C-alpha cells in the first residue's frame, strides 16, 4: 500500500495571496502617473509668469460699487526687460540638462526629481515677494528656478530605466511627457482667471501653482521609492 499524501493546507492561501498581488494595480503605473503630474506641474511653474506678467505691467480696470476704476500697473518694466525676465528661466534650465543625468545616477532619480520640484515650487511661491523687492532679484530667482527644474527630464529617464519593463518603456515614457502640453494647456487659461479674479490679483497665479507643486512633492515623498 502506498501512503496517502495529505494536501498542503498552506499552499492554497499562498497561491491566493500571490494571485491577489498580481491582480493589484502595478506600482510602476503609480510612478508613471506621478511623473505625468510632476512634469505637468513643472510646465505650470514655467509658463504661469507668461500670463501674469501682462497683469503686472499693464493698467487694468476693476468694478467697485458700480463704478469702473482703472488701476495703474504695479511695475513699469519695458518690453525688453519683460523679455529678459521671461527668458531668464531658460538660462538656468539649459545648464542642468546633461549634468542632471549624472545627478540622477549619483543620488537617485526619484530623490532628485522630488527635491527639485519641491524647491521650484517654493521659488514660485516666493516670486511675488521677490518681484516687489527687486527686478534683479526676480531675474536671479527665475534663473535658479530653471536650474532646479532643468533636472526633471534627465531624472524622468533614470526613473523609467529602473521601473519600466523593456516592453512598456516607450509607451510609459510617452505618457509621462504628455504631462508637459497638458500642464501648459491647463495653466494658460487658469492663470488668466487667477490674475483677474484671484484674491491677490496676478500674485494668485504664483500662489496657486506653487501650492500645487508643494502638494505634489509631499505625495511623491510618501509613495514613491527608488526601485
Tell where the protein language model's regions lie, with residue ranges:
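Helix-to-loop junctions at the C-terminal end of transmembrane segments
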Residues: 95-109, 195
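Glycine-rich segments within core transmembrane alpha-helices of 12-TM secondary carriers
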Residues: 168-199, 204, 210-213
